[in-house]
Amino acid sequence: MSDKIGLFTGSFDPMTNGHLDIIERASRLFDKLYVGIFFNPHKQGFLPLENRKRGLEKAVKHLGNVKVVSSHDKLVVDVAKRLGATCLVRGLRNASDLQYEASFDYYNHQLSSDIETIYLHSRPEHLYISSSGVRELLKFGQDIACYVPESILEEIRNEKKD
């Protein structure tokens, strides 16, 4: 029997405790879970890709079956096929997230009918945390320590020094 391999993707700009919770829970469902940082190289992100990847790798180092990868200009289903993933993992905070994700699920299934999508609901304590909300707080100099993993906080601090 082959390994169960999953893929959880996002821009993680920055990664939040909500993302980490989904990763930890999904890691228990798969033999191998890839966390894919998908980014647009033509768009200026808040945190450079290297910082996002380094912070994410540190945040998940306690999960032996999780590997962080990055991609650009590729469809999620193509990356999933390349990695041998048969399941995409998506986190949901609310009905709007479900509606948004369902449209991608439709196209992904049309492109590759053997790849399934599973949805994990956010824990109540993470329902209102978003990367855009964290970026907004940072813009106004607010403390974000309770919204992001320590490793991400370190990357943001290091980036601000430069």
From Swiss-Prot:
<feature type="site" description="Transition state stabilizer">
    <location>
        <position position="19"/>
    </location>
</feature>
<keyword id="KW-0548">Nucleotidyltransferase</keyword>
<keyword id="KW-0460">Magnesium</keyword>
<feature type="binding site">
    <location>
        <begin position="91"/>
        <end position="93"/>
    </location>
    <ligand>
        <name>ATP</name>
    </ligand>
</feature>
<keyword id="KW-0067">ATP-binding</keyword>
<keyword id="KW-0547">Nucleotide-binding</keyword>
<keyword id="KW-0963">Cytoplasm</keyword>
<feature type="binding site">
    <location>
        <position position="90"/>
    </location>
    <ligand>
        <name>substrate</name>
    </ligand>
</feature>
<dbReference type="InterPro" id="IPR004821">
    <property type="entry name" value="Cyt_trans-like"/>
</dbReference>
<comment type="similarity">
    <text>Belongs to the bacterial CoaD family.</text>
</comment>
<dbReference type="GO" id="GO:0005737">
    <property type="term" value="C:cytoplasm"/>
</dbReference>
<comment type="pathway">
    <text>Cofactor biosynthesis; coenzyme A biosynthesis; CoA from (R)-pantothenate: step 4/5.</text>
</comment>
<dbReference type="InterPro" id="IPR001980">
    <property type="entry name" value="PPAT"/>
</dbReference>
<feature type="binding site">
    <location>
        <position position="43"/>
    </location>
    <ligand>
        <name>substrate</name>
    </ligand>
</feature>
<protein>
    <recommendedName>
        <fullName>Phosphopantetheine adenylyltransferase</fullName>
        <ecNumber>2.7.7.3</ecNumber>
    </recommendedName>
</protein>
<feature type="binding site">
    <location>
        <position position="101"/>
    </location>
    <ligand>
        <name>ATP</name>
    </ligand>
</feature>
<keyword id="KW-0173">Coenzyme A biosynthesis</keyword>
<feature type="binding site">
    <location>
        <begin position="126"/>
        <end position="132"/>
    </location>
    <ligand>
        <name>ATP</name>
    </ligand>
</feature>
<feature type="binding site">
    <location>
        <position position="19"/>
    </location>
    <ligand>
        <name>ATP</name>
    </ligand>
</feature>
<keyword id="KW-0808">Transferase</keyword>
<dbReference type="GO" id="GO:0004595">
    <property type="term" value="F:pantetheine-phosphate adenylyltransferase activity"/>
</dbReference>
<feature type="binding site">
    <location>
        <begin position="11"/>
        <end position="12"/>
    </location>
    <ligand>
        <name>ATP</name>
    </ligand>
</feature>
<dbReference type="InterPro" id="IPR014729">
    <property type="entry name" value="Rossmann-like_a/b/a_fold"/>
</dbReference>
<dbReference type="GO" id="GO:0005524">
    <property type="term" value="F:ATP binding"/>
</dbReference>
<feature type="binding site">
    <location>
        <position position="76"/>
    </location>
    <ligand>
        <name>substrate</name>
    </ligand>
</feature>
<dbReference type="GO" id="GO:0015937">
    <property type="term" value="P:coenzyme A biosynthetic process"/>
</dbReference>
<dbReference type="Pfam" id="PF01467">
    <property type="entry name" value="CTP_transf_like"/>
</dbReference>
<comment type="function">
    <text>Reversibly transfers an adenylyl group from ATP to 4'-phosphopantetheine, yielding dephospho-CoA (dPCoA) and pyrophosphate.</text>
</comment>
<comment type="subunit">
    <text>Homohexamer.</text>
</comment>
<feature type="binding site">
    <location>
        <position position="11"/>
    </location>
    <ligand>
        <name>substrate</name>
    </ligand>
</feature>
